[in-house]
Amino acid sequence: MAELTTLARPYAKAAFEHAQAHQQLANWSAMLGLAAAVSQDDTMQRMLKAPRLTSAQKATTFIEVCGEKFDAKAQNFIHVVAENDRLPLLPEIAELFDLYKAEQEKSVDVDVTSAFALNQEQQDKLAKVLSARLGREVRLHAAEDASLIGGVVIRAGDLVIDGSVRGKIAKLAEALKS
C-alpha cells in the first residue's frame, strides 16, 4: 500500500495544485472519484493490463468510457497518467487528492462506530467536541457494530480513540497476561 501511495503522490499533488490554482477543487474531486471508480471495473482493469494496447489507446478508451464528465485538463491528466502506465493507481490518486483537499479546507472525515445507533443530537454533540479537539470541521460518518458491547470507536485519519467495552476488555486481558 505504501508503495502505491508513493507512486500516486506526485500525480495527486499535481492535480491538487492545478485544481486549487483554478478554484476547481470540487470538480476535480468529482472527476478523480469517477476515474477511480471506472478504473476499478473488472472490464476496465483487463483493458488497462492489455499489453497490445498503447498508453494513448488506453487513455482514449478510458476517457470515452467516462463520457463528457472530464474537461480538457482532466483528459490531459489522464493521458499523462497513462503515458507513465499509472492508470491503475487512479483510486490512490483520488484518495490522496481528497486528503489534500480536506487538509486545505481544514476538514476531516471521522468514522464513529458505536455499539448502538447514535441519534442526531448525539452525533451533533460528538462532532462539536471532536471539532474542538481536532481544530477542524468534522464530517461525521456513524456506523453500528454490536460486537463493541458498549461505547464507541472513533477514527480520524491516523487518530484512533477506542472507548468501546470490547477494547477495554482486550486491554484488561493483555494486562493480565503480562
UniProtKB/Swiss-Prot annotation:
Molecular function via GO: proton-transporting ATP synthase activity, rotational mechanism
GO cellular component: plasma membrane; proton-transporting ATP synthase complex
InterPro entries, A to Z: ATP_synth_OSCP/delta_N_sf, ATPase_OSCP/dsu
Subcellular location, record wording: Cell inner membrane
Membrane topology, from the record: Peripheral membrane protein
Residues spanning the membrane: none
UniProt keyword annotations, A-Z: ATP synthesis, Cell inner membrane, Cell membrane, CF(1), Hydrogen ion transport, Ion transport, Membrane, Transport
Record carries keyword Transport: yes
UniProt KW Transmembrane keyword: no
Family affiliation: Belongs to the ATPase delta chain family.
Function: F(1)F(0) ATP synthase produces ATP from ADP in the presence of a proton or sodium gradient. F-type ATPases consist of two structural domains, F(1) containing the extramembraneous catalytic core and F(0) containing the membrane proton channel, linked together by a central stalk and a peripheral stalk. During catalysis, ATP synthesis in the catalytic domain of F(1) is coupled via a rotary mechanism of the central stalk subunits to proton translocation. This protein is part of the stalk that links CF(0) to CF(1). It either transmits conformational changes from CF(0) to CF(1) or is implicated in proton conduction.
Subunit architecture: F-type ATPases have 2 components, F(1) - the catalytic core - and F(0) - the membrane proton channel. F(1) has five subunits: alpha(3), beta(3), gamma(1), delta(1), epsilon(1). F(0) has three main subunits: a(1), b(2) and c(10-14). The alpha and beta chains form an alternating ring which encloses part of the gamma chain. F(1) is attached to F(0) by a central stalk formed by the gamma and epsilon chains, while a peripheral stalk is formed by the delta and b chains.
PANTHER family tied to this protein: ATP SYNTHASE DELTA CHAIN
The protein, known as: ATP synthase subunit delta
Organism: Pseudomonas savastanoi pv. phaseolicola (strain 1448A / Race 6) (Pseudomonas syringae pv. phaseolicola (strain 1448A / Race 6))
Source lineage: Bacteria, Pseudomonadati, Pseudomonadota, Gammaproteobacteria, Pseudomonadales
Protein's gene: atpH
